């Protein structure tokens, strides 16, 4: 294949040809000899034949030269290795070695690519003797191709070693004939793949031709043997030590980088490469140019000494004895050489095969890409050539289609109108026919009706698109068979005749021959031709007529006859007669003939139609006779089969129902029996647990009483009371001697005998008591071992020797005086400490649980010398209170406050990490006070210490036994635990059970049965008002009595004021009602109930979010969408500041608004030269005007005025206006503003001239005395004397009316859509900028206009104690027309409307006004922090002083805030969050508590109101609770009352009464919440459906599919979590927001997630109402009121 490759060189930045061989380093240099497109793709070379090793290097069997380099190119963009200095110019790398890494892609041209026919797979024949422009040395590699090994076969079989290894001196070589070895084109394949040329420089003369080609191949080797030895540096490595051939695709191998000198030389050679890189136009290089500008530096000429040395060495070699080639001793070397040659040949063949495949594959890919590119280009050309015409054609077609569509629509309308008119005509004709008396007239009307009917049918067919003739379309729905054929091809389009055939048997149709069929076809065709010619068909067929008809029919269908030409007769009379005859014919005869023809046609068509119908009936008779019996048989068989199937189905269904009924009865009876057995088993299990707890309580009580008797000497102390309290009769020998502890799992509750259970309960209870005492005894009896304490790293505590008298008095170190009930509590706590029992002090809030706990620590320190360590854990909000109380009441006990950052806590731990042996009075601390959060964080440090006493304040924080806080606290080493809580029961009985489990984990184990009994019976009693088992209640009280002490205020504290609770009901405002109705219409209560029955967690979360949205509506609608501040679109530049933090208390913010439009003035106009009124060296006119016109020639000069003031001079009027000559001269030099400013404040001395009335007419001034200088009338105008009075109003009618009607206080009705400051004038002159600033910010002018004194002037007035009246003047600018809008168009939301938009806030506004007048102070509690933000705006609007405390308040700020409220009576309101501000703080300065929104946990509200109703409160505390009527808040309040009743029944033991608990008994909390969203009607409907479902034995709301939620339950997200996330936990960083509490986005107005379906109207869609007309009106009114706000589409 000849010619250059059919493609262009590829840029090195393009995609690699071989992706799988891509090198790891992408920054290698580009070697042009390894270009991807210099392979010869079209040829697929044949595989190498197996050759001997000797032939592998022969020129007769050459290998194709490898396209890969002989050596690995240097990495990282280095230059190729240096060439040998003595190498020939043909083998030296030319100046291209110094080219950049990436060469530019060359275009396809004959000057670069080869044009000869040299193939790369055989020996190439050079075309001329010029040296190659392509180096044979280290070729360049493409940066995208894989590196090949350093070994490759050359074109003559010579291994491709580096040039330095193959180049030998050529001095002793015989002269040879120089043959052209390469093509002239350095980029051709022949130039690359041909063998090496002669190693002589170009200037040498060609040598004579060589003898044979074989020695040519062996010439380098022989020359190497005969050449004299060279120095070591220039000597090539011997062939015997040549490296083994490397694999075909090895990893890249690193080589040394060339020196900087060689690299610099290559860079210097770049221009030479540029000169040589442009070949001549004919594609050949000029030898002269190549000789003059060689590619490599000239060879070094040998000196005479070196030449002599070389000759001497060569002579010595010639004189040496020649060895025999066939001599033995080299067999192994020969074999090794042969093996290596074969191996090299095989490796080369294998590598070449791989490369051949890769070249072929790459060529095919390239070819495919070329075809694809050409196809794409062809498509683009076609598109460019034809796109416009196609678009025009399509547009024209669309236009034509649109015209046709319009025509069709017009035709359709005309036809419809025709049908309507013809129908009217038909009805009218039928009506007239019915009324007609004459038969002819009646027939006439009937014909008219028939014509109208036919026209209607025709028009309807045209409308329906039916194009078949009427007479054919009515016979059969199929098209007519024009080709003829048998009658069997007719379609059965009519029902069979009602007449039954008289024949009984089946009738077979006779067969027809081909002749008969052909005759029928001919007859049909002739008939059709006759119909087309409008000829009548004969009654009998005639053969001759048939042929004529056939012939005429075909002729008519095909072509009409040519008329005979007639010659015209030209005559005027003839023409007139002819035209008259034709006129008469057209006027009279043609319509008549037309009517006759139409009538005959209709008659003929009707006859043909009847004939066709009769023929169709006749043709179907044989089918009826043939298929009738078979169809009847099949129908009877099918009917019988259906009846049988229905019978057996019914039978099987009945049997299945009976079987299921029997099975169901058996299952129900089995379930009933199993339920009874399980009930008995649960009863025994519960009885065992209660008995065990009762026995433990009994033993504890007996131990305490025994200790009391031992100490007092009386063993019968309160024996009767004990017997009355505990009615248990436990004999002394009831417990067996060997009875041991029995695990709960090992007990058999199925046995009928309960004696074993009783014994096990008694043994377990006694063992629990013994364990508690042993544990306390072991804690106290720890021996003092300092070394052991040092070794173990734990503390050693002293043991009290005696507890002293049981009647404990107040400790002397306690500075406060304990009350009687507090002293009893101290006795109870000491008794518990003595027995080693933990307890719960559950006194009502405000009774001094803190002081009782402190007194216990003081007692232990004073009486028993136990100084700790004591651990107090409290909420973060009460830590400062604990520290202050301990320091205040017991100064001897040292307190270590443990809170702060991690670094601070690490420093504090040094106080108690030291290994103290004892804790004495001199210890560094005795009590450590910390919070629950820090205990959990530093639990590892607290567990190392043995605490003497651990006090947990507000113990409801550990109400969950599954929390990490509960588990960590349970693992602390302490002798006793004391829980302080004012509300042991908050939500349910399980919380109380968790506290009991915490104080006695061994006894009060977390048994599900006991917990269920605790919760279910009592709560169901509170809900359903049922009778609680008195025995169970007494047993419960007996269980709780030894461990819990609770007193209430009304029983123990008589001097404490009363607490009055009032529920204040509020109504929804119009806006709130619209929001509430919109939310309720978006959800379906029935769907929520059904989903709640399934128990999906996602639905529960959705329901809680809905409750949140409803409560937000009740609080304030602005929680959804705030009224925004509105202003026009201002196009201006505004100054920006980063922060005001570094500014002082007073920040002067200057006017910095600039217009976007700037008008630049030339510098000349702003200078003195361009100003007419500014004098200067460049402006002589201003000086002339000022000197001559303003002074010398001024008419207001005093001299001129003096001369002109006499008699009737020009200035004689000055005497009448009370102006002197000096004043007139001074005013002439002032501007308008200065003159107005000087007149400000001066009284109108001439106002008396305006007086037109006198008390007496006689006192009226005379006419000649009115202009006298002496005042004759000192009376002033009445309207100026006083601002009040009728005269003042009469003189200012418009102003007084405007103010009296309130027009100046209404809000502006409209505002401009956009605003902009004036155009800014700019100039490059600094003086112009200064002048404009002085004009804009002139302080005296601004003070005169706005009457606003500067801050500096006010400070001077205060410092110098001056009278401010002279410095205060009314503003010169008039008052604004609107006091709301004033001088700005910025509209701020109205606070009055902000108050009236919420019913609660409006009621609170009235309440606070009354409380403020009565001198009360208020605690205002909220559930939502965003509502507190809104309340702050309201209090600022009403000018009420307030302070705030919520979950975001810092710990140090909280203490100062509480102290400010307690000590500053001017603070009227204290805003608190229910959770954050309801624990452990004393706010007795307030006597009024207002709950803006209540918590559904009543104990939280009780704690909050007890912040004011506690010890130290001397006034009556009034609690107001704001409740929105008819909303979800009423139902939440009812639920809170139920919880209060549970607490009262359990703790106080009272009976249920006083509260109506006849509410719904729901087991599912989610269903209860869903019921809160329903109104009364919906609740009644749901109750009715529940009752119906219970009557049917179904579960209301359960899924019919029977699918159960089997997935693992997540932690319940309660509404408390959603309301109070982050509150109450000041330092709790782990509390992450749930994302459901108080969303800020206004997009959540609806509050309904996407998963909640919107109810639809109709049957079975629940009670959700759709959008009514009233709702739409509400939405429109809301948008009008709120400024296009609201809930969106409802």
Curated annotation (Swiss-Prot):
Residues 392-468, 623-694 form a coiled coil. Residues 253-273, 395-407, 416-453, 513-524, 621-635, 1673-1682 have a biased composition (Basic and acidic residues). It is an enzyme of class 3 (hydrolase). GO terms for cellular component: chromosome, centromeric region; chromosome, telomeric region; Ino80 complex. Residues 830-1002 form the Helicase ATP-binding domain. Residues 581-706 form the DBINO domain. Residues 1-306, 395-527, 618-637, 1619-1690 are annotated as: Disordered. Residues 213-227 have a biased composition (Low complexity). The keyword Oxidoreductase does not apply. Pfam families: DBINO (PF13892), Helicase_C (PF00271), SNF2-rel_dom (PF00176). Residues 1403-1563 form the Helicase C-terminal domain. It is found in: Nucleus. Residues 1656-1672 have a biased composition (Basic residues). Keywords: Activator, ATP-binding, Coiled coil, DNA damage, DNA repair, DNA-binding, Hydrolase, Nucleotide-binding, Nucleus, Transcription, Transcription regulation. The keyword Iron does not apply. Residues 30-41, 111-127 have a biased composition (Polar residues). ATP binds at residues 843-850. A motif (DEAQ box) lies at residues 953-956. SUPFAM superfamilies: P-loop containing nucleoside triphosphate hydrolases (SSF52540). ATPase component of the INO80 complex which remodels chromatin by shifting nucleosomes and is involved in DNA repair. Belongs to the SNF2/RAD54 helicase family. This is Chromatin-remodeling ATPase INO80. It comes from Aspergillus terreus (strain NIH 2624 / FGSC A1156).
């Amino acid at each position: 294949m000849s010619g250059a490759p059919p493609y262009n060189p590829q840029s090195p930045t393009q995609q690699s040809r071989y992706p799988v061989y891509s090198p790891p380093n992408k920054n290698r240099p580009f070697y042009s000899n390894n270009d991807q497109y210099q392979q010869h793709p079209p040829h697929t070379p044949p595989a190498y034949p197996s050759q001997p090793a000797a032939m592998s290097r022969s020129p007769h069997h050459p290998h194709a030269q490898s396209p890969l380099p002989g050596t690995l190119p240097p990495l990282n963009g280095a230059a190729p290795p240096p060439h040998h200095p003595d190498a020939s110019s043909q083998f030296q790398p030319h100046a291209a070695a110094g080219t950049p890494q990436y060469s530019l892609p060359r275009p396809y041209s004959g000057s670069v690519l080869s044009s000869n026919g040299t193939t790369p797979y055989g020996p190439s024949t050079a075309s001329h003797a010029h040296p190659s422009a392509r180096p044979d040395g280290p070729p360049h590699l493409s940066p995208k191709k894989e590196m090949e090994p350093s070994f490759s076969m050359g074109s003559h079989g010579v291994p491709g070693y580096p040039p330095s290894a193959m180049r030998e001196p050529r001095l002793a070589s015989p002269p040879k004939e120089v043959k052209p070895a390469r093509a002239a084109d350095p980029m051709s394949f022949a130039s690359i793949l041909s063998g090496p040329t002669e190693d002589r420089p170009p200037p040498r003369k060609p040598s004579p031709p060589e003898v044979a080609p074989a020695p040519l191949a062996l010439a380098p080797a022989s020359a190497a043997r005969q050449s004299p030895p060279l120095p070591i540096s220039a000597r090539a490595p011997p062939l015997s030590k040549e490296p083994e051939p490397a694999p075909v695709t090895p990893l890249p191998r690193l080589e040394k980088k060339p020196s900087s000198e060689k690299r610099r030389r290559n860079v210097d050679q770049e221009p030479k490469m540029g000169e040589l890189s442009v070949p001549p136009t004919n594609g050949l290089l000029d030898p002269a140019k190549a000789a003059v500008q060689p590619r490599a530096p000239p060879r070094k000429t040998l000196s005479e000494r070196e030449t002599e040395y070389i000759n001497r060495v060569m002579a010595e070699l010639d004189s040496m004895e020649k060895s025999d080639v066939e001599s033995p001793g080299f067999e192994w070397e020969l074999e090794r050489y042969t093996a290596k040659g074969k191996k090299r040949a095989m490796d080369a063949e294998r590598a070449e095969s791989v490369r051949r495949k890769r070249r072929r594959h790459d060529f095919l890919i390239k070819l495919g890409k070329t075809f694809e590119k050409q196809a794409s280009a062809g498509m683009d050309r076609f598109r460019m050539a034809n796109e416009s015409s196609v678009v025009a054609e399509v547009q024209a077609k669309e236009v034509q289609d649109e015209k046709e569509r319009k025509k069709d629509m017009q035709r359709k309308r005309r036809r419809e109108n025709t049908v309507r008119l013809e129908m009217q005509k038909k009805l009218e004709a039928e009506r007239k026919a019915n009324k007609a008396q004459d038969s002819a007239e009646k027939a006439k009307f009937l014909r008219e009706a028939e014509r109208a009917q036919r026209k209607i049918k025709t028009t309807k067919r045209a409308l329906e698109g039916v194009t078949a003739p009427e007479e054919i379309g009515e016979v059969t729905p199929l098209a007519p068979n024009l080709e003829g054929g048998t009658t069997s091809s007719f379609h059965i389009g009519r029902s069979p005749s009602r007449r039954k055939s008289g024949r009984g048997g089946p009738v077979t149709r006779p067969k027809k021959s081909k002749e008969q069929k052909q005759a029928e076809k001919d007859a049909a065709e002739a008939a059709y031709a006759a119909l087309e010619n409008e000829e009548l068909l004969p009654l009998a067929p005639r053969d001759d007529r048939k042929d004529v008809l056939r012939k005429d029919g075909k002729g008519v269908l095909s072509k009409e006859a040519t008329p005979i030409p007639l010659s015209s007769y030209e005559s005027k009379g003839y023409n007139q007669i002819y035209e008259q005859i034709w006129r008469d014919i057209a006027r009279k005869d043609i319509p008549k003939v037309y009517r006759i023809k139409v009538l005959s046609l209709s008659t003929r068509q009707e006859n043909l139609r009847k004939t066709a119908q009769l023929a169709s009936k006749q043709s179907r008779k044989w089918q009826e006779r043939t298929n009738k019996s078979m169809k009847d048989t099949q129908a009877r068989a099918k009917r019988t089969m259906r009846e049988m199937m229905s019978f057996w189905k019914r039978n099987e269904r009945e049997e299945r129902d009976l079987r299921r009924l029997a099975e169901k009865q058996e299952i129900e009876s089995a379930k009933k029996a199993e339920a009874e057995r399980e009930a008995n088993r649960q009863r025994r299990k519960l009885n065992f647990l209660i008995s065990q707890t009762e026995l433990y309580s009994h033993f504890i009580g007996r131990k305490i009483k025994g200790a009391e008797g031992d100490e007092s000497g009386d063993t019968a102390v309160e024996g009767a009371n004990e017997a009355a309290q505990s009615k248990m009769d436990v004999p002394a020998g009831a417990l067996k001697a060997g009875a041991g502890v029995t695990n709960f799992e090992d007990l058999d509750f199925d046995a009928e005998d309960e004696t074993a259970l009783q014994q096990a309960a008694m043994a377990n209870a006694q063992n629990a008591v013994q364990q508690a005492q042993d544990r306390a005894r072991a804690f106290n009896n720890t021996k003092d071992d300092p070394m052991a304490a040092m070794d173990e790293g734990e503390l050693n505590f002293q043991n009290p020797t005696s507890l002293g008298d049981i009647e404990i008095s107040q400790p002397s170190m306690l500075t406060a005086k304990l009350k009687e009930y507090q002293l009893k509590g101290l006795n109870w706590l000491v008794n518990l400490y003595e027995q080693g029992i933990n307890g719960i002090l559950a006194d009502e809030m405000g009774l001094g649980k803190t002081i009782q706990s402190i007194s216990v620590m003081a007692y232990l320190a004073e009486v028993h010398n136990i100084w700790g360590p004591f651990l107090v854990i409290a909420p973060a909000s009460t830590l400062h209170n604990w520290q202050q109380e301990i320091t205040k009441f017991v100064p001897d006990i040292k307190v270590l406050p443990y809170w702060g950052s991690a670094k601070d806590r690490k420093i504090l731990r040094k106080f108690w990490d030291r290994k103290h042996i004892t804790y004495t009075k001199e210890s560094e601390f005795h009590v450590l006070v910390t919070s629950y959060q820090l205990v959990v964080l530093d639990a590892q440090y607290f567990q190392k210490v043995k605490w003497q006493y651990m006090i947990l304040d507000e113990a409801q924080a550990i109400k969950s036994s599954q929390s990490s806080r509960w588990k960590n606290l349970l693992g602390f080493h302490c002798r006793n635990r004391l829980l302080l809580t004012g509300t042991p029961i908050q939500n349910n009985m399980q919380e109380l059970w968790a506290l009991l489990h915490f104080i006695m984990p061994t006894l009060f184990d977390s048994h599900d049965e006991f917990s269920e009994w605790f919760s279910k019976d009592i709560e169901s009693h509170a809900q359903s008002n049922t009778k609680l088992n008195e025995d169970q209640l007494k047993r419960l009280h007996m269980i709780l009595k030894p461990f819990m002490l609770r007193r209430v205020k009304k029983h123990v504290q008589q001097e404490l004021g009363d607490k009055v609770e009032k529920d204040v009901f509020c109504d929804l405002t119009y806006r709130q009602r619209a929001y509430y109705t919109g939310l309720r219409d978006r959800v379906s209560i029935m769907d929520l109930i059904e989903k709640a029955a399934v128990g999906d967690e996602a639905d529960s979360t959705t329901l809680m979010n809905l409750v949140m949205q409803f409560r937000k509506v009740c609080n304030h609608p602005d929680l959804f969408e705030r009224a925004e501040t509105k202003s026009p679109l201002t196009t201006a530049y505004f100054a920006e500041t980063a922060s005001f933090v570094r500014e002082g208390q007073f920040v002067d913010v200057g006017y910095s608004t600039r217009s976007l439009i700037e008008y630049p003035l030339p510098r000349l106009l702003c200078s003195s030269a361009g100003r007419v009124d500014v004098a200067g060296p460049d402006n002589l006119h201003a000086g002339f005007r000022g000197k001559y016109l303003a002074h010398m020639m001024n008419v207001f000069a005093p001299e001129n005025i003096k001369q002109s003031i006499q008699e009737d001079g020009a200035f004689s009027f000055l005497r009448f206006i009370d102006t002197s000559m000096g004043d007139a001269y001074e005013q002439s030099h002032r501007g308008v503003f200065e003159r107005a400013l000087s007149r400000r404040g001066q009284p109108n001395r001439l106002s008396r001239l305006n007086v037109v009335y006198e008390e007496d007419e006689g006192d009226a001034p005379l006419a000649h005395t009115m202009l006298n200088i002496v005042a004759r009338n000192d009376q002033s105008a009445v309207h100026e004397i006083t601002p009040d009075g009728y005269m003042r109003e009469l003189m200012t009618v418009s102003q007084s009316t405007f103010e009296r009607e309130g027009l100046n206080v209404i809000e502006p009705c409209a505002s401009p859509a956009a605003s902009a400051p004036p155009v800014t004038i700019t100039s490059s002159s600094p003086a112009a900028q200064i002048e404009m600033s002085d004009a804009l910010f002139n302080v005296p002018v601004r003070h005169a206009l706005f009457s606003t004194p500067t801050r500096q002037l006010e400070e001077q007035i205060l410092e110098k104690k001056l009278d401010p009246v002279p410095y205060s003047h009314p503003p010169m600018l008039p008052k604004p027309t609107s006091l709301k809008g004033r001088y700005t168009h910025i509209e701020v939301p109205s606070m009055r409307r902000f108050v009236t938009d919420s019913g609660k806030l409006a009621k609170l506004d009235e309440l606070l006004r009354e409380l403020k007048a009565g001198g009360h102070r208020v605690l205002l509690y909220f559930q939502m922090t965003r509502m507190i933000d809104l309340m702050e705006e309201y209090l600022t609007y009403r000018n009420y002083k307030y302070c705030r405390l919520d979950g975001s308040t810092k710990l140090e700020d909280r203490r100062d805030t509480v102290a400010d409220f307690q000590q500053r009576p001017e603070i009227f309101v204290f805003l608190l969050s229910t959770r954050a501000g309801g624990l452990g703080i004393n706010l007795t300065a307030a006597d009024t508590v207002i709950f803006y929104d209540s918590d559904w946990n009543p104990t939280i509200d009780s704690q909050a109101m007890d912040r004011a109703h506690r010890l130290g409160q001397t006034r009556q505390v009034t609690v107001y609770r704001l409740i929105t009527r008819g909303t979800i808040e009423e139902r939440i309040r009812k639920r809170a009352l139920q919880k209060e009743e549970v607490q009262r029944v359990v703790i106080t033991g009272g009976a249920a009464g006083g509260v109506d608990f006849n509410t719904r008994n729901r087991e599912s909390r989610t269903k209860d919440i869903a019921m809160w969203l329903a109104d009364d009607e919906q609740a009644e409907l749901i109750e009715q459906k529940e009752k119906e479902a219970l009557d049917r034995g179904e579960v209301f709301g359960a899924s019919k599919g029977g699918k159960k939620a089997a997935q693992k339950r997540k932690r319940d997200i309660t509404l408390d979590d959603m309301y109070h996330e982050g509150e109450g936990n000041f330092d709790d960083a782990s509390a992450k927001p749930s994302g459901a509490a108080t969303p800020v986005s206004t997009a959540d107005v609806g509050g309904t997630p996407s998963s909640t379906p919107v109810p639809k109207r109709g049957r079975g869609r629940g009670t959700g109402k759709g959008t009514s007309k009233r709702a739409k009106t509400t939405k429109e009114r809301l948008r009008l009121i709120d400024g296009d706000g609201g809930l969106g589409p409802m």
